[in-house]
Curated annotation (Swiss-Prot):
GO cellular component, one term: cytoplasm
UniProt entry tagged with the keyword Transferase: no
Name by which UniProt lists this protein: Glutamate-1-semialdehyde 2,1-aminomutase
Organism of this sequence: Alteromonas mediterranea (strain DSM 17117 / CIP 110805 / LMG 28347 / Deep ecotype)
Gene name as annotated: hemL
InterPro entries: 4pyrrol_synth_GluAld_NH2Trfase, Aminotrans_3, Aminotrans_3_PPA_site, PyrdxlP-dep_Trfase, PyrdxlP-dep_Trfase_major, PyrdxlP-dep_Trfase_small
Gene Ontology terms, MF aspect: glutamate-1-semialdehyde 2,1-aminomutase activity; pyridoxal phosphate binding; transaminase activity
Catalyzed reactions: (S)-4-amino-5-oxopentanoate = 5-aminolevulinate
Enzyme class per UniProt: isomerase
Cofactor: pyridoxal 5'-phosphate
Residues the record lists as N6-(pyridoxal phosphate)lysine modifications: 265
Gene3D superfamilies from the UniProt entry: Aspartate Aminotransferase, domain 1 (3.90.1150.10), Type I PLP-dependent aspartate aminotransferase-like (Major domain) (3.40.640.10)
Matching PROSITE patterns: AA_TRANSFER_CLASS_3
EC number, UniProt record: 5.4.3.8
Highest taxon of source: Bacteria
Length: 426
């Protein structure tokens, strides 16, 4: 670990905290972050040459595994024609058509560069479309680092213990109404008070930033009904779940149609890509066809579009998800069986190729309060034990894990063998 330690010390002199995204700093689990030099399939290697089975998968994008050959070749080919034009390309058109085909609720699509851009723009659009100010989000759900969304947020904000960030003016935060995930009554109550001024509900249909928490039965359907009743826009933040919990995202898996959808991560094949889209009558309020302004110098970047198209073309092929979901289930079942074997209080959640492990005696974790009351000290011991065994999990107990096409039965078996050793020490 000498090289990672030296790089971390060096990085802290010129990069805040030594990292460019807070959760990477290992602040939640302690110790030195591993500096990665390469990745392939289900594996990554650090600067000291140690190999890891990777369950972060770049925080979700790499559903086909690291260093996927068709994506790599598409990026190389596209880059030979130029890196950025600042003008429309056919690749953008093909990408929008493909996204609309795979996620039919997205009748029109606007490309951006990140998930944060997508959610920020979708909320502005919802406000412009409805001429209302307030938005509803859920405790522990993270939708990027836009000011109005950093109120009781999840992900790195939750890990740092500052779910409502300093630097967000009170007169901005007051328009963000926060309610309990998986609790329809709390949503109904807030609408009874503020319904006439609520522009939208934004929700992760599977909460992936307070670990992995699927919706309880009827929750998403209830949000749809409330938005219909009050004329508010329902936004699904599928930056994490899009093309990961099913080919058509969480909205296909749970059969609930939002008005707007935000995508990121998988859609870029590892490159920085996001998009938002939805009902034609709403999307046409975006400039240049409407008055709601949104723009981006690198939006629709040709190299990024090439990577995304190569990823989605493979994802469209029949049978891909069957094996990924089967292996994810085997992993999660294995964790649970081993924890039971060693008398460890553990519960697990799963949604497609996303999973969560919670050190708790609660039978099923369904909300923010249960998630933050899990045994983080025990998770940290498990985390470092697995890291020592060559298994790279998310360095925070509030982050979901991800399985890719490259995580075959052999990889799962190796992971569970490592977990057996680590559980025996807890």
């Amino acid at each position: 670990m000498q090289k990672s330690e030296a790089l971390f010390t060096r990085a802290q002199k010129t990069i805040p905290g030594g990292v460019n995204s807070p959760v990477r700093a290992f602040k939640a689990v302690g110790g030195t972050p591993r500096f990665i030099t390469k990745a392939d399939g289900a594996y990554m290697w650090d600067a000291d040459g140690k190999q890891y089975i990777d369950y972060i998968q770049s925080w979700g994008p790499m559903i086909l595994g690291h260093n996927n050959a068709p994506i790599r070749e598409a990026v190389i080919e596209a880059s030979c024609s130029g890196l950025s034009f600042g003008a429309p390309t056919e690749a953008e058109v093909i990408m929008a058509e493909l996204v609309s085909e795979m996620v039919p609720s997205m009748e029109m699509v606007r490309m951006v560069n990140s998930g944060t851009e997508a959610t920020m723009s979708a909320i502005r659009l919802a406000r412009g479309y409805t001429s209302r100010n307030k938005i509803v989000k859920f405790e522990g759900c993270y939708h990027g680092h836009a000011d109005s969304l950093l109120v009781k947020a999840g992900s790195g904000a939750l890990t740092l213990g500052v779910p409502s960030s300093p630097g967000v003016p009170a007169n901005v935060a007051e328009h963000t109404l926060t309610v309990e995930f998986n609790n329809l009554d709390s949503v109904k109550e807030i609408f009874e008070t503020h319904g006439d001024d609520i522009a939208c509900i934004i929700v992760e249909p599977v909460a992936g930033n307070m670990n992995c928490i699927p919706p309880v039965e009827g929750f998403l359907e209830g949000l749809r009904a409330i938005c219909d009743q009050y004329g508010s826009v329902l936004i699904f933040d599928e930056v994490m779940t899009g093309f990961r919990v099913s080919r058509g995202g969480a909205q296909e898996r749970f059969n609930v149609k939002p008005d707007l959808t935000c995508l990121g991560k998988v859609i870029g094949g590892g490159m920085p890509v996001g998009c938002f889209g939805g009902r034609r009558d709403i999307i046409t309020h975006i400039a240049p066809t409407g008055p709601v302004y949104q723009a981006g110098t690198l939006s629709g970047n040709p190299v990024a579009m090439a990577a995304g198209l190569a990823a989605l073309t493979q994802i469209k092929q029949p049978g891909l998800y069957d094996s990924i979901f089967e292996n994810t289930q085997a992993l999660v079942d294995g964790f649970q069986d081993l924890a039971d074997k060693h008398n460890i209080s553990l519960t697990t959640n799963i949604a497609g190729s996303m999973f969560g492990i919670f050190f708790t005696d609660v039978e099923k974790v369904t909300n923010y309060k249960q998630a933050i009351n899990c045994n983080t000290e025990q998770f940290n011991k498990f985390y470092h034990g697995m890291l020592e065994q060559g298994v790279y999990l998310a360095p925070a107990s509030y982050e979901a894990g991800f399985v890719s096409k490259a995580h075959d039965a052999e990889v799962i078996e190796k992971t569970l063998a490592a977990a057996d050793k680590v559980f025996s020490t807890l």
